[in-house]
Amino acid sequence: MNVTFYGVRGSCPCSGDRYRRYGGNTSCLVIHIEGDEPLIVDLGTGLRAYGDVLNKEVRALGTPMHATALLTHLHFDHILGIPFFGPLHDPGARLTVYGPGQPKGTLKDALHAAVQPPVFPIHMEQFRGELITVDVGAEDFSVGQAKVMARPIPHAGVTLGFRIEADGRSLAYMSDHQAPVDRRTIPDNVLELCQGVDLLIHDGQYTDDEFADKADWGHSTAAYAVHVAAEAGVRRLLLSHHDPSHTDRELDRILNGARRLPEAKLIEDVSSAHEAQSIDLGKA
């Protein structure tokens, strides 16, 4: 199982030399499992860049794109890549999206409402490829060889966290996770998703000082991510969903601070995600 990151920012994209090393695109990563179609996780602006890569692959093979995506929630920074995903505009292409059903309407209703005039020039029905949606709640299912566990996690609006297992390896993904005010309590669903995984990709958007002013904004601190990882017996922690205001230097400082925490000693590796990073989890 191999994981490649195409977007690691939260809230909105950013650009400029001060953000170059970590990258400015919003949440999108791709899991490659030998013999399976690509498994995309979140559909932020990084999806456009992945579309460029995938277009070259499918054109070399002479076959249309078939892929599956896991969508945590419907905030703009997690869906903005959809209309700019090049392969989805090719005849015969198919993208199946598993994501949270909504209190009023379906996942399909919500996505179609977000991609239509006047906010986008065409309706999603006019894409030449096919986008299939599957509403998901607290359930387990399979995508190819991957076993997927989906559970609701605290955030603003209906939001899922995912655990993916394949090739005897496991990862948990919680890009948007509201830390509790005490920053110690861990919800049972979160522990279930994270328990003993090889890699935890976790929201680390705020510093402790920022969290003091934004405790109800739906996100975590790097310190809380370390706490979750240590309590769940995670092997490796990767901080993600970086705040768009945090420069490369600031993200380095946040990471160094996280690594100095006493609980970090219980984790094999604590790092921060960056665009174009690829992690090979191998096979058990």
What are these regions (language model features)?
Residues 1-172, 191, 248-284:
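Binuclear metal-dependent hydrolase catalytic cores
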Residues 181-269, 273-274:
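Cap/insert and terminal regions of metallo-dependent hydrolase folds
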Residues 41, 72, 174-175, 202-204, ...:
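Active-site flanking residues adjacent to catalytic metal/cofactor-binding acidic residues
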